[in-house]
A protein has these predicted regions:
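Terminal targeting signals and extreme-terminal segments of soluble enzymes
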Residues: 1-172
Length: 172
């Protein structure tokens, strides 16, 4: 939705080359940080194309998709966006519990929270619901988010401001 209109190879890759259509309910963090530091992120997601009627395939696809945005509540608490220059991000572990079968080629609501985010680490938890509100899976992930310090942080802020201005111009 946001990235599809940006004429840049990375934006186009994120928008169209991945197999999932992801629509943010809460403001997307691609360019700008959230206006307020909060610990909640919500997206609707589904595959772009229909999948076969294999429950194992749908579980595998949901596991894959669950990693796309689970660090975003942690980014929100740190007050940064994905474009933050000099930021290092990594998933440290990822666990998933399946409660009921679900089709990932139909819209699923992924509600994510971060009960703890400090010291370059954070815990992201998520719940995946069908359109009728049925809970189908629960997710937990610990992530690392390192921001540059000192002079590197000052240089990164200048680069980040320039990049955000350029991307905002493209988005208009």
């Amino acid at each position: 939705d946001v990235l599809g209109g940006i004429n840049h190879p990375v934006a186009q890759e994120w928008a169209w080359a991945r197999p999932f259509d992801i629509r943010h309910v809460t403001p997307a963090l691609y360019v700008d940080p959230a206006p307020e530091t909060e610990n909640r992120n919500m997206v609707w997601m589904k595959t772009f194309t229909p999948l076969a009627d294999d429950p194992a395939l749908h579980r595998a696809a949901l596991t894959y998709a669950s990693d796309y945005t689970l660090l975003e509540p942690i980014l929100r608490q740190h007050g940064v966006a994905w474009i933050q220059p000099g930021m290092s991000v990594a998933s440290l572990d990822h666990a998933m519990w399946f409660h009921r079968p679900a089709r990932v080629d139909q819209w699923l609501l992924y509600v994510q929270d971060s009960p703890s985010a400090q010291g370059a680490r954070g815990l992201g938890t998520g719940a995946v619901f069908t359109e009728d509100g049925t809970l189908v899976a629960t997710v937990a992930q610990e992530g690392m988010i390192r921001l540059p310090e000192g002079a590197a942080a000052r240089r990164a802020r200048v680069r980040g401001a320039a990049q955000r201005m350029a991307l905002r111009t493209v988005l208009r």
